[in-house]
């Protein structure tokens, strides 16, 4: 939760504070862990896990026998699947979804960061960045965009903007302009479907 003091701080001297989810509520524990479940240093990115009275004990019935769901709660800790970091004041910053992270050329790349940069290009409506299997890189950063009605944007404009705005290893290897995106049951862009479609080409 962001406190009144956090809002004041964010509006006067530290605007990044307002991009955080704030501090854990009373009775809620939050940790940032690596793949082995060990805490990462302050400021480093890892999976967000949480414990407290708000966390379920497990799943009822048949779902409780399914390892794909039971692995979410382990030893009382809910493994959220979100990637984030804690600052020195224990504020939580969410970075991306763990399943969306791209590993390319040995680098961990967070699609949301690239999507936010591409969204700055005038005329871009929606953006989806995914990692596509690649023999050379492991995964290839690929960006798909839809445009606002009447907008005239080409792939090279987007590539040039990325080149000027981010580290070289994060830049998309390919930018595609599409008419629409497949959506999941909650109305969000279905990145898994996009990834599968691209890899099937």
What residue spans do the PLM features occupy?
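Conserved AMP-binding/adenylate-forming
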Residues: 1-91, 98-101, 114-115, 150
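AMP-binding/adenylate-forming catalytic core of the ANL superfamily
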Residues: 36, 52, 57-58, 76, ...
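A short, polar/charged loop-to-alpha-helix boundary motif
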Residues: 198-201
């Amino acid at each position: 939760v962001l406190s009144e003091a956090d809002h004041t701080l964010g509006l006067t001297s530290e605007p990044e504070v307002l991009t955080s989810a704030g501090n854990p509520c009373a009775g809620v524990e939050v940790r940032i862990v690596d793949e082995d479940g060990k805490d990462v240093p302050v400021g480093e990115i890892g999976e967000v896990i949480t414990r407290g009275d708000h966390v379920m004990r497990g799943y009822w019935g048949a779902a409780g026998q399914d390892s794909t769901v039971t692995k979410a709660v382990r030893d009382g800790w809910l493994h959220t699947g979100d990637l984030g970091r804690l600052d020195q004041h224990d504020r939580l910053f969410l970075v991306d979804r763990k399943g969306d992270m791209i590993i390319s050329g040995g680098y961990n790349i967070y699609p949301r960061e690239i999507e936010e940069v591409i969204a700055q290009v005038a005329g871009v409506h929606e953006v989806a960045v995914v990692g596509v299997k690649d023999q050379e890189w492991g995964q290839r950063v690929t960006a798909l965009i839809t445009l606002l009605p009447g907008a005239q944007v080409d792939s090279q404009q987007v590539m040039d903007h990325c080149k000027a705005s981010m580290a070289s290893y994060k830049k998309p290897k390919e930018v595609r302009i599409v008419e629409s995106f497949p959506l999941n049951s909650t109305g969000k862009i279905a990145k898994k479907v996009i990834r599968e479609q691209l890899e099937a080409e």
